């Protein structure tokens, strides 16, 4: 029995998983990845702007990120934003492009990043559980309003729980992949 609530819940939970994937993309592992820069905002003519909106980001080598700003006057601001970020990257500017060398992670930094990934996963599990609670409340209101019988209520709640379990398991899988990626030397 698929109710409209179940479809909406699945969409919300898929959105939560997508947000977690984005979050994990911003946590750097030992390799260069253009997503690492997604959270950095550059003061571009007084407006906080994502780097990917003021320049092209490429990965020419496994440990090198290259930013080619479309407006060369923004280079200094891009460098400043990267240097002030918590990524631990040192930008070098040759007048045309900004190169970022992604250093190998120390064991301590790896553990720190794994902890950060674990914390993010836990926050997203809470979001999934909150979505479950909201869906169950809607289902109970439908039963009180006479739209569902008691048996249908139980089936609908069981379906919500199955979906919740599936998405929590997916978060655990994503976390273990990310931790493996981070801890890889």
Swiss-Prot record:
Responsible for the release of ribosomes from messenger RNA at the termination of protein biosynthesis. May increase the efficiency of translation by recycling ribosomes from one round of translation to another. The keyword Cytoplasm applies. It is found in: Cytoplasm. The keyword Protein biosynthesis applies. Belongs to the RRF family. Keywords: Cytoplasm, Protein biosynthesis. One of its GO terms (cellular component) is cytoplasm. This is Ribosome-recycling factor. It comes from Clostridioides difficile (strain 630) (Peptoclostridium difficile). GO terms for biological process: translational termination. HAMAP family: RRF. One of its GO terms (molecular function) is ribosomal large subunit binding. PANTHER family: MITOCHONDRIAL RIBOSOME RECYCLING FACTOR PSEUDO 1 (PTHR20982:SF3), RIBOSOME RECYCLING FACTOR (PTHR20982).
């Amino acid at each position: 029995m698929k109710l409209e609530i179940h479809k909406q819940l699945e969409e919300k939970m898929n959105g939560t998983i997508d947000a977690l994937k984005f979050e994990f993309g911003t946590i750097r592992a030992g390799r260069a990845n253009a997503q690492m820069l997604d959270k950095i905002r550059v003061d571009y003519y007084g407006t906080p702007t994502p780097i990917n909106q003021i320049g092209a980001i490429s990965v020419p080598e496994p440990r090198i990120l290259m930013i080619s700003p479309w407006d060369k006057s923004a280079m200094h601001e891009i460098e400043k934003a990267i240097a002030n970020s918590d990524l631990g990257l040192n930008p070098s500017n040759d007048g045309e492009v900004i190169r970022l060398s992604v250093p190998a992670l120390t064991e301590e930094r790896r553990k720190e990043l794994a902890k950060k990934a674990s914390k993010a996963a836990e926050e997203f599990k809470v979001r999934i559980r909150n979505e479950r609670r909201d869906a169950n409340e809607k289902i109970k209101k439908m039963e009180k309003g006479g739209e569902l019988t008691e048996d249908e209520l139980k089936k609908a709640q069981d379906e919500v729980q199955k979906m919740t379990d599936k998405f929590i398991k997916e978060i655990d899988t994503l976390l273990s992949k990310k931790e493996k990626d981070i801890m890889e030397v």
